A protein has these predicted regions:
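FMN-binding flavodoxin-like domain, especially the glycine-rich phosphate-binding loop
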Residues: 24-31, 44-47, 52-170
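N-terminal beta1-alpha1 ligand-phosphate binding loop
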Residues: 2-24
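Alpha-helix C-terminal capping/helix-to-coil transition sites in glycosyltransferase folds
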Residues: 40-42
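Conserved SAM/SAH-binding loop
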Residues: 33-36
């Protein structure tokens, strides 16, 4: 199997997951999105992103829009709980980018895990706290927990998920 892992990472979270995934995919190339090759000619195209306002970040989104006629698996990191409604919405948004009918892709699955939030984004959220994202005790606790991720367990779960996605290609 010829696999391609492309990732966009702001804090290193998504890169860490990308490296874990690449380690279990035979015949795998791994590239940051800035230097990623065109997605054509691969049996599996895995694209990783950090969640920005409920969507894949701009660089990952631009790359995803180039993927056509491919078997695709997505992965991402976000500050929210990975089993939250927000996370499910983020997964749907990412898959919608790939599933546009004119692109003729097949999404094999998505893996999303929690990751530390860039301190600049946390500071920005605190400035606009009263408007959109108030810094409640729950939000503060979630951000503190997110700072511990991705951890080894997150990497192992990503590897297991992608072994399963790869089996769909073989």
């Amino acid at each position: 199997m010829k696999a391609l892992v492309v990732y966009s990472s702001r804090t290193g979270n998504t890169r860490k997951i990308a490296e874990a995934i690449a380690a279990v995919l035979p015949g795998c190339e791994i590239h940051p999105v800035e230097s990623a090759p065109a997605p054509e000619g691969y049996d599996l195209v895995a694209v990783g992103y950090w969640v920005d306002k409920g969507m894949p970040d701009a660089q990952a989104k631009a790359y995803l829009e180039t993927v056509r006629d491919a078997k695709v698996a997505l992965f991402g990191t976000l500050g929210a709980w990975p089993d939250s409604d927000h996370a499910r919405d983020c997964i749907a948004q990412g898959e919608a980018l790939v599933n546009a009918p004119e692109r003729r892709n097949k999404v094999l699955g998505t893996y999303l895990c929690q990751g530390k939030v860039d301190p600049k984004i946390v500071a920005m959220m605190q400035k606009m706290a009263s408007d959109v994202h108030p810094m409640t005790p729950e939000r503060k606790a979630r951000l503190e927990d997110a700072a511990k991720h991705p951890d080894e367990a997150d990497c192992l779960r990503a590897q297991e998920a992608f072994k399963g996605f790869a089996e769909q290609v073989a």
